[in-house]
Structures are given as C-alpha cells and as structure tokens.
Amino acid sequence: TLADYIDSKVEGKAQDTDQLREVANIEKAMDYIEQIMTPGALLTEQTIRELHAMTVHDLVREGDKTPGAYRSGAVRISQSDHLPPDFIQVQAYMQELVDFVNRDDSPKYDLMKVALAHHRFGWIHPFGNGNGRVVRLLTYALLMKYGFNVSTGGRVLNPTAVFCNDREHYYAMLATADHGTTVGLEEWGTYV
C-alpha cells in the first residue's frame, strides 16, 4: 500500500515486496515525466515505452516479460468485453496516437485530447501487462505537455489515479467509448 511505501522510505527499509517496488517504479516514472515533459514538448513512442519499462521493472506478479516492448501476442483485458487489436497493428496504432497528441491544435481542445488519448491507449493495449499504470502515467504526461499545472502543492501519487476510485464506473465509461460513436466519446470526455 501507499502507507507501507511511505513508511519504508521514511524508515529507510529495503523495498523488498512487489507492491512496494510497484509504487517505487511509478514514483520513478513520474519523476522522469516531470523532467522531460514541459509545455509543448513532443511525446514519443520511445517515451511511452520507457514509461512501461520503468513501471514493470523488477516486478514478478505485475511485471512484463518484455519491459518497454510492444506485445507480441493477443491479450485480454480483465473486466472488459473489449478485445484489443491484433499485435501486428499495435505499432501503427501507437504511431497514430503519438501523431494525434503532438498535432498542433487549438489549446481549447487539450483536455479532450487527453481524454481521447487515454481511451485510445487503453483500446490499443500495446503492452503485455502494465497498460493501466502506463495509461495513467501517459495521462499525467499529457496534462503536463499541454501546460496544466498538475504538480502544485507537491504530489503524493499520480493525480489521474482518481480513475481507480470507482473502477466499475471507469470500465463502464471506457466501454461506452469503445463503441466509437460521437455520443460514446463525448460521454467519455465528460467523464474524464
């Protein structure tokens, strides 16, 4: 838990459990985002892959056999009816996503772009494991890229972790957006 992680840092204990390493990995990835992601910075596929590698580093249960590499087979998403695209299509979809978030649009669309990118990444599900953690980090990075002040007052954890407060509702809203309709995507955008 977060409390255990904070205790381990304060008391100088070794981070010897998967759960503590998972929180430490997320903290490291957030530090990385805060170093590289400034307003207007380009987001690259390499950055996303690096976030994945950091997130799953040295994890047993929640790790990935190929940190930082796109998946090489089919995956299923727990608690979802969505079947992600074939792994052969992942590279092209990820390039399309990166092109979309880096496109020079009016700032009035920035929050909508964050919402759409969050959904699209989840829809693609590019990695074998760790996609949920990476999409929340990606969302954090995009908020910084678009100039939203998300680190005021210090941070304890990723502000996009609020998506986990009601996972059932989160998954239901993702499923609504999965239909690809204007109405479904608008409902998702309003939710985010």
Q: Where are the language model's segments positioned?
A:
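FIC/Doc superfamily catalytic core
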Residues: 1-192
